[in-house]
Design a protein with these regions (language model features):
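Divalent metal-coordination and catalytic microenvironments
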Residues: 37, 55, 73, 84, ...
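Active-site core of metal-dependent hydrolases
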Residues: 209-322, 337-339, 377-379, 400
Length: 429
């Protein structure tokens, strides 16, 4: 059977099917030929035909083809990723959330801090061919009264959570190695996909540690982070670390973490103390260290776009853009692995990508590769995803226009394919 892509195109307001196949990999599926497409190779688009065979991408025509889709010279890219969002959890409207992620072409999501019980409640809806794929850290490691303890308090006050959802569930308060010894086994029993840790103004750790005025604005002793990283790596787990300022970025690198969550400057206010913009500037030596160690850095800069460039805070917007541009240019200089993550509960990485594009640090090809490949690789480092290569999972998006010429084309998705299955509108809704 041969069909044109126009006959398969899914409306951006449609609902997507998901949730009837067990496991993360599909059983035997149709052998589908995708002809007359322009396929992104990480740098440019090359015109060729691709095939999905049992959920795997190949560019060699199989002996038998069950269906042929004419891509009509449109542009094929890997799916997008979201390397930092806490919104895949039961307090959210999960069905609507999944629909929106798929609509936006985001197939892979990383949740770096969640309630283990919340993960259990959404498990049946995710990590299957017709849905999004998600990894979870479960509870994060911080100091008593440190971030994210204030989130637990807020949800208790709202009647959503109880005290049991705090220390030992959503987070683990750790003051020293003895306390880590007592709680580490409990944490591992939750079967995390990776480890989330927190550094907040770590150069001021001793002053903040026992002072209640810094509630929610403090994190781990940076010396203790070294031990956590060692234990995590011994258990086969990667470590992600929340940072606020450049001093935290430095401490995370010294500890040997695998991923830094947020670039310094993702927020420059809110703390008890006022901080100069210079405190958020990454040092040249730290950028070189991040590149040398292969550390992933998740951006989380899109919040700056909410500051009206022509409004009363125009100067703050200008300063934020200048800082973000400076740090991105430095990380780019040393080829640091940059992944996109929004940390925006009600949004995703589409605005994040558009904001970074507006800074004109990266050409469209590099930004697209960051969003598709690097982001996917830090979410699922052991899977063959994020690139349109022989033997990789047959997951991709088809765009109406060329995103290398106009990056806004990333919002013009005409077809979505995940593990060899064409995602279609749910006609029952």
């Amino acid at each position: 059977m041969r069909v044109a892509i126009a006959a398969l195109a899914v409306s951006i307001i449609a609902s997507f099917c998901y949730g009837q196949t067990d496991g993360n990999h599909p059983k035997e599926t149709k052998r589908i030929a995708f002809e007359n497409g322009q396929w992104f190779d990480g740098h440019a688009f090359k015109r060729k035909d691709g095939y999905a065979v049992n959920g795997i991408l190949t560019f060699h025509r199989p002996a038998k083809v069950d269906e042929t889709v004419d891509l009509e010279d449109q542009f094929v890219v890997p799916p997008f990723g979201e390397a930092h969002n806490h919104n895949v959890e039961p307090l959210n409207k999960v069905d609507e959330l999944i629909r929106r992620y798929l609509e936006h072409g985001i197939f892979y999501v990383k949740n770096p801090n969640n309630l283990p019980s919340g993960r259990d409640q959404v498990a049946a809806k995710i990590n299957r061919p017709e849905s999004i794929d998600v990894t979870f850290s479960n509870g994060g490691f911080t100091v008593a009264g440190g971030h994210p303890a204030e989130i637990v308090k807020r949800n208790i006050d709202r009647g959503f959570w109880t005290e049991a959802d705090g220390d030992g569930a959503f987070y683990y308060a750790i003051a020293d190695e003895a306390e880590l010894d007592r709680k580490w086994a409990q944490f591992l029993q939750t079967k995390p996909d990776f480890v989330k840790t927190y550094l907040l103004f770590s150069d001021d750790y001793k002053a903040r540690k026992d002072d209640p005025k810094y509630y929610g604005w403090k994190g781990l002793d940076p010396a203790l982070l070294v031990t956590i990283v060692q234990r995590a790596h011994a258990a086969g787990l990667r470590v992600s670390t929340h940072v606020e300022i450049a001093a935290d970025f430095h401490a995370a690198l010294v500890a040997g973490v695998d991923e830094i969550n947020h670039m310094p400057g993702f927020r420059t206010s809110g703390d008890v103390k006022t901080h100069a913009m210079s405190e958020f500037e990454i040092a040249d030596s730290e950028a070189r260290a991040a590149a040398r160690q292969g550390t992933y850095v998740v951006t989380t800069l899109g919040g700056a776009a909410a500051i009206d460039a022509k409004g009363p805070d125009a100067s703050l917007r200008s300063e934020s853009d200048k800082l973000n541009r400076r740090n991105l240019e430095l990380l780019k200089k040393y080829h640091v692995k940059l992944a996109l993550g929004s940390d925006s509960y009600r949004s995703d990485t589409v605005p994040e990508a558009l904001y970074i594009e507006s800074l004109h640090v990266f050409d469209n090809s590099d930004l697209l590769a960051m969003w598709c490949a690097t982001t996917a690789n830090t979410i699922f480092p052991k899977r063959l995803i994020g690139s349109l290569k022989e033997g990789y999972e047959a997951s991709f998006l088809v765009l109406k226009a060329n995103p290398l010429e106009n990056f806004d084309a990333v919002q013009q998705i005409t077809l979505r394919v995940k593990q060899g299955k064409i995602l279609k509108a749910d006609q029952s809704r």
